[in-house]
C-alpha cells in the first residue's frame, strides 16, 4: 500500500527490430519511455551528431499522414453517432463495451479499410445534405411566392407585349393607403391587384410602351419593389412543382437516414480503426524519444520494479539475445522525474481519488492514501450521519456496479461512494437517525448531546493534526533535514500532547497528575524549538525564527476550530431531515400516504444531495488544509506507460 517502486530501464536493439519491439512493449503496457535528448548523459552525443532520433523524414511524413487519417476517422465517428437509434440510458449502460484483443486490433487496422468506409459514408452524407438543402431552398421559394399564387401572368410574358408594358411587384400598405390611392388615380397606369396583406399590396401594373422610364421613376418614388421571378410558369404551377420536389427529396432523406441509422456495424469498424490508428501513432511518436546509430537503437524509460522479471522473460521469449535489457535503481537526482503509480488494496484504492484531486506524491514521499481513507471515511460519515441515507447510497452504487458495464474511472468513483455510504450508515447508528427520525438506540443524541459531538469533533481534529505533524517529521527525517523534522514536526506533536494532558488534568477529577507532565512537556519542547533554531542558524537571529515558529500555536487552534464543521454539518442535516418529517406529519392520515409520501421523497432527496455535497467538499477541505498542510508536498507525475489506445475499444488480454 504505497507508491510503487520504480526502476530505470534501458534497452538496446537492432534498428530493424524497433517496430516489433515497440509493438511488443505497447501490448504489455509496462514501460513509460522518456526523451533521451533531454537527459544530460545523452545530450553530448546528440550535439556531436554521434546519435540521432530513429524518426526519419519519411517517418515524420508518415506521422503527419497518420494524424490526418485520425482526424478524418474521428470526424466521421462524431458525425455518424447522432444518426444511430437513440438508446435508453439504462440500456446503454448495460451493454458490453466494444472489445478486441490487441493482436486482433492490429490485424484489423492493417487492412486499412477505413478508406472504403469513409468514401461510402461521405457519399451518403452528401446525398443527405444535398436533399436537405433542396428542401430548404424549395420551402424558402414557396414562402416567398405563396402570396403570388393567384397571379395569372409572368414577368417573362409581360415582356413580350408590343403596345403596353407591365410590371409586377409590391407597394407598401400604410394606414392611410395614400400610395395605392395615388397610383390608382394616375391616368397613365392600370392596376390589377393580386394580393393584399398587412404590410404590402401586390399588383400587376400596365402602362403604354413609351412611358417606361417615367413610370419606373414614379413607382420607385412610391416604394414599388419589382417581383424577382424568372420562371415561365405562372406561380401556381411553379409552386405545385416545388411541392412535388419537396416530397421527392423527403423520400431521399428518409431512405438515406434509414441507411445511416443501420450503419452501426460501420460505426464500430471506424471505432476499431480509430483505436488502431491512435495506438500506431503512439508508437511512431515514441520514436522521437529514442536514440540511434546507423544500426542500433537505444530506449530508456521507467518500469515498476515488480514488473521487471516478467518483462525480461517476455522479451527473451520474443527477441532472444537481440535485445539487451538493463535496469538501474532510482537515485536521489531522479526523484523529481520518476512517474508515480499508486498501489493499494481494494478498500483503500477508491480513496486515491482524494489524493489525486490534491496531487500525486513525489517519489520520496509516502502515499498518504491509506491514512486519508481512514480520516475521510470518518469525516464524511460524521457530516451526513443517517442510516437511511447511508444504506441508500451503498445500495444504489452497489446496484450500479453489479448491473452496469462501467468504465474503470466511473467504477472507481462508485466504489468510493459505496464505502462512504457504509460510513454514513454507521454514524447514523451512533446518532440514531433514520431519514430524520430519531431511533431509540442512539449512542449520541443530536438533540441533547450537542456538546459531546462538539468535543468528539475537536478530538478527531486533534488526532488528525498530530498525525499530520508526525508524518511531516518522518518525511524530513527521510530527507535528513533533522532541524525541520523537530521544529515543524515532533516538537509540536509533544507540545500539543502536553497541552492536551494539561487540559485533561484540569478538567477531569483525579487526573491532576497529568498537569505537571503536560506543562513541562510543552515548556521543554517550546524551549527546544528556540535552542534548535539558534543552533541551526549558528547565530542569535535564529531566536526570531524560533519565536515565530512558536506563534504557530494560534494556527493549530484555528485547525481545531475548523473541525467543528463535523458537528455543525451533522446536526444541520439531521435537523433539516427532522423538520421535513414534521411538515409531512401535518397532513391528515390519507394525505400522508399520497401527497405526503411524494413530498417526503422529494424533500429528503434534496437534503440527501446537499448533505452528500457538503460532506464531499468539506471532507476534502479538512484533508487538504488541516491534514496535508502539515506534511504533504505532492506534485508527482502520473505513470503513463506506452499502451494500446482505449478511446472506444476495451483491449482484452
Spans of features found by a protein language model:
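Conserved, carboxylate-rich catalytic/transport cores that coordinate ions
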Residues: 2-7, 14-30, 309-653
